[in-house]
Structures are given as structure tokens and as C-alpha cells.
């Protein structure tokens, strides 16, 4: 198993903050400081033998360029990404469905107020 490297950044208060994985970065700095790859790695949760979650997330973003590029892809297409299996794909699909429902609710509320 690869040793996690400690990473450092300065938070909004000017304090030095360290973490070893994307979840630690999110907790210590906030989600807005995380890259798309780091957020996706958090959703993926764990890696596969020889491939950490961060690397799997990088491969997904490389394949689809962005979250927007991933949105309407059939679930079957994600199986071609090394390290992605059913549970990880289900987590990603669930996260995208949650985001879609949030957007739909915001649009619905906005349209309701404008009429």
C-alpha cells in the first residue's frame, strides 16, 4: 500500500493546515478548496489494488473532461475506467442524481416565484 503524503495549504484565516487525503482537505479547508478530482475521489471512497481513489478520479475526469461531460453518460461506459466497479459507479450515479434533483428544485422554486 502506498504511503499517503502529507499536504499543506493556508486556510482563510491564514493558518497552516495539513491533510493526507481529499476528505481531510475538505474537512480542514472546506469543499470549495477541493478540485473536481478530489471531490470525485471522496465519492469513490476507496481505491482498488494498486490504484488509489485519487488516481481513479483523475482517470474519470481525463476521460470526460469535467463533471458536465459525465452527466448523461450511460452507467455502462464507466466500467471501462480502470479501478471502477459497480459500487463506485453506483456512488457516482447517486451523487449526480442528488445534484440533478437539487438543480431541478432550485429551478422549480425560481419559476414559482417569477409567475
Residue ranges and their predicted role:
Residues 2-81:
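Long, highly charged, low-complexity intrinsically disordered interaction regions
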Residues 32, 100-101:
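Short, compositionally biased low-complexity segments
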Residues 48, 96-98, 110:
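Alpha-helix termini
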Residues 65-66, 79-82, 97, 112-115:
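Short alpha-helical linear motifs
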Residues 88, 93-99:
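Structured, non-catalytic alpha/beta "coupling" segments that mediate domain-domain communication
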Residues 103-115:
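Long, charged amphipathic helices and adjacent flexible linkers at domain junctions
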Amino acid at each position: 500500500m502506498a504511503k499517503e503524503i502529507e499536504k499543506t495549504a493556508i486556510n482563510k484565516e491564514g493558518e497552516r493546515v495539513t491533510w493526507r487525503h481529499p476528505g481531510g482537505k475538505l474537512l480542514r479547508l472546506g469543499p470549495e478548496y477541493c478540485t473536481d478530482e478530489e471531490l470525485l475521489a471522496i465519492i469513490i471512497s476507496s481505491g482498488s489494488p494498486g490504484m488509489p481513489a485519487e488516481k481513479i478520479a483523475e482517470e474519470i475526469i481525463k476521460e470526460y473532461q469535467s463533471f458536465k461531460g459525465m452527466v448523461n453518460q450511460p452507467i455502462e461506459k464507466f466500467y471501462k475506467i480502470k479501478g471502477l466497479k459497480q459500487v463506485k459507479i453506483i456512488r457516482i450515479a447517486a451523487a449526480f442524481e442528488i445534484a440533478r434533483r437539487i438543480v431541478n428544485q432550485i429551478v422549480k422554486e425560481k419559476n414559482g416565484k417569477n409567475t
